[in-house]
Amino acid sequence: MLKDKSQKFDLLLFEAYFIPLLALSHLFKAPVIQVSSLGSMEENLQIVGAVSHPLLYPTSLHQKVYDLTLCDKFAELYNEYSINQVLNRFIQKSDEVLSRIFGVEIPPLKELKNNVDMLFLNIHPVWERNRPVPPNVIYVGGLHTKPEKELRKDLKTYLDSSKHGVIYISFGTNVEPALLPPHKIQAIINAVSKTPYDVLWKWNQDELPGRTPNIKISKWLSQSDLLRHPKIKLFITQGGLQSTDEAILAGVPLIGMPMLGDQWFNVEHYVYHKIGIKIDMDTISEEKISKAIHTITKDDSYRQNVVRLRTLMYDQPQSSLERAVWWTEYVIRHSGARHLRAPAANMPWHQYLELELVSYVVLGLLSVITLAIIVLSYLYKFVQKQAAFRIKVKGS
C-alpha cells in the first residue's frame, strides 16, 4: 500500500510523536492532522508555530514546572537542550531510513512538516498553563474517556463490601511494577497494610511478594469505571496523563510516583492544583507514603479541589470527542486547513527570533560606538596638543 500511489485518502491522521509518518503525506497528497495522545512536544509546537518557552510554557517532558529556583531553571534549560539534540539525531536518522525505503525523491522531514494542517492535543489547556496557540491547534483533553459502565460482579461486590473504603494502586501499562526494586515495593506494602483501608493493586504477576490480607491484586481492571465507585478513597499512580484524566473525571485525589516520560510534568500539576501529593521514587519510604495517605484521606480539601478542577475542565459547549469530530470533518470539507497555519509554523528558530535583524542592529550599534570612540579619541588628542602648544607659547 505504501508504494501504491493510486490509493486516495481524504485525510491522514497520525500520532504526533511519530514524525516519520509525514512521509505518507507526500505519497498520498492528503491533508494531515497530527494527534498527540499525550501533551505537547517542542517539535509538534514548532511545526504549527505555537508558542514554546522552556520556563513559562514548558512541554510535557519537563520535570519541574512551578516555583523554579535558579538551579531548577538551569536544569530545565539543559533538559530542553538535551531533548532537542536527541530529536535532531532522530530526524536525521529517519531521513536516511525514509530515503532507503521510498527513494531519494522523498523530501526531508523538515520540508514534510509543512504538510501538517492541524494538531490535536489530548490535554486540557489548564494542564498546559494556558499556552497561546494558533487556531489549528485543538485541545481535546479527555478524548479517551468513556461513559460509565457497570463493574464486573466480583469487583463490585468487593468494593461495596469494603467497610472503610479502598485505595487503588496502578502504575499504568508502560511500567512493570514487578521490576521495581523490592525494597520500594515493600515500602508501599508496609505503608498501605497499616491503614484501615482495603487495597486494590493492578499487578501483572500471579503473586505479590509480601502481600498482606488487606491487599487484593488483579492483572486487569476497568480503571475509569473503578475510579468512579464511591468507595475509592485514593489513587496511587505513576502519573500518566490518561490515568490522571480518569481520576479527575471521577473526583479522586492522587498520590503520584513519577518514573518516566511526562509523569513528572503531570505530578507537578497535582501539587500545584492541590489535588494530590508527589513522592519521589528515588527517596521513597514507608514513612513518606504513610504520611501522604493520611494527609489525603483526612483532608477533604484534596477531593474538593479535584471536583472543582473537573468542573473547570469539563464546563465546555461540546465534548472533546465532538470537538475532534467537528474539526476532522472541517479539514476534510476544505481539503486541508493551511489557512489556519501561523506565520511562524515550521520556521527555524534563527528566523523566528530574527537573529539576522538583531545582528545588523548589534553591528550598527558597535559601528556607531566604535566611530564615537575614534572621534572622541581624536578630539582628546587634539585638545591635548592644543593645550601643550599654548603652554609652550606662554613659556616662550
Where do the PLM segments sit?
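Conserved catalytic-core segment of nucleotide-activated headgroup transferases in glycan assembly
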Residues: 114-115, 129-216, 221-223
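Classical protein tyrosine phosphatase
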Residues: 19-45, 137, 179-200, 243-260, ...
